[in-house]
Amino acid sequence: MLPDQANDLRKLVLRAGRGGGLNDAPPPKIVVVAGGKGGVGTTTVALNLSVALAREGRRTVLVDADFAGPDVAGLCRIDEQYGAADVLAGRRTVHEVLQRGPGGIQVLPASRGLTDPSDCTPQAQERLIAQLEGLGPHADFVLLDVGSGTGRTMRRFWEAADAVLLVTHPDTVAVMDAYAAVKLVCQDNPLRGRILSLANCVPDAEAAADVHGRLDRACRRFLALKVSAAGELPFDPSVPRAAAEQHPFLLESPAGPAAAGMNRLAIEVPRLVEAESPLHTHFRRRAE
């Protein structure tokens, strides 16, 4: 599907989802939370960042788009009978499958209906994206947990995002995998949003700065892309403990070091996302 066709389809689907009426509310900011490999904590980050944003007064929707390994429903203790897979297939609308999650967020689980996201047609991808963009009257931020997937559907989510928050660990392999994910997604399709980096499970600020620096230098040198440091999360034993109890660590241990880092992230991410360059703004207006 050509870009103009995709944009036309998205507007049609969005208009249908709104019942054909006019909606002057700006679309929510869409942030994709991704990792270069499994196990770096994308779901934990996406869930707790959603809660932290809600505590900052930002109406937030969390979408489980990691169809290969959906974990959001379990961590939120909600039913996953219907979800994003049903929206992609046209069986349900986003409004029909949104559920209330912890900490005042809204959650769109993945559901069990999609085993291979590469099977999604361009029309299905645009259907979901259009409905998420139509949540402006109800949401300020939409966070998509895409895990470590870089297939066609995941790449489309990256392209549609206002920002991609790339989660990585401090080890060399994790940083290399994060760079490889950016290269794979961006080599053929430029992103309209920013790329942000989050250093997870770091021992100190120096290690976090090293992670951000290595990733940014590699992307600048070989891809001509800038990666902005969004923050870091220190290793905190309360994080795996809260995950085992199916509870956000931000609510389980609000005074812990990881919670402090997440609260800082909830301030920094909106600042970076909302500070659009003229190029990004121009691109978005053309797309809409």
Cite the ranges covered by each PLM segment:
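Amphipathic alpha-helical transducer elements in NTP-driven molecular machines
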Residues: Q81, R91, H95, Q125-I129, ...
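NTP-binding/hydrolysis catalytic cores, primarily Walker-type P-loop NTPases
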Residues: M1, A244-E288
